[in-house]
Amino acid sequence: MKINQPAVAGTLESGDVMIRIAPLDTQDIDLQINSSVEKQFGDAIRTTILDVLARYNVRGVQLNVDDKGALDCILRARLEALLARASGIPALPWEDCQ
């Protein structure tokens, strides 16, 4: 999936997450995580984000994640909404994801 434009999904409310994405000129993934529960769940948050990016074959992006204790399912949903917005497609290609 090609990320064409910057996008934002989520809120800064307790129990939610705000994620910002922007395309990069390289194929790297620049991941910045700021979380109120990073000491306990930082590795799980990072793993979830990288799993979703790999599932949709996303490379060459900068991600800024401001987590306020979001559950894994909320993190995945916000990230999938973000990918759809940033790629300019109306819906995610569910049948193509791995």
Swiss-Prot record:
On induction, the UniProt comment says: Repressed by H-NS. Part of the citCDEFXG operon.
- Location within or outside the cell: Cytoplasm
For this protein, the record's InterPro entries field holds: CitD, Mal_deCO2ase/Cit_lyase_ACP
GO BP of this protein: acetyl-CoA metabolic process; citrate metabolic process
The subunit field of the Swiss-Prot or TrEMBL record says: Oligomer with a subunit composition of (alpha,beta,gamma)6.
**Entry's NCBIfam families?**
citD, PRK13253.1
Q: What is this protein called?
A: Citrate lyase acyl carrier protein
Q: Which gene encodes it?
A: citD
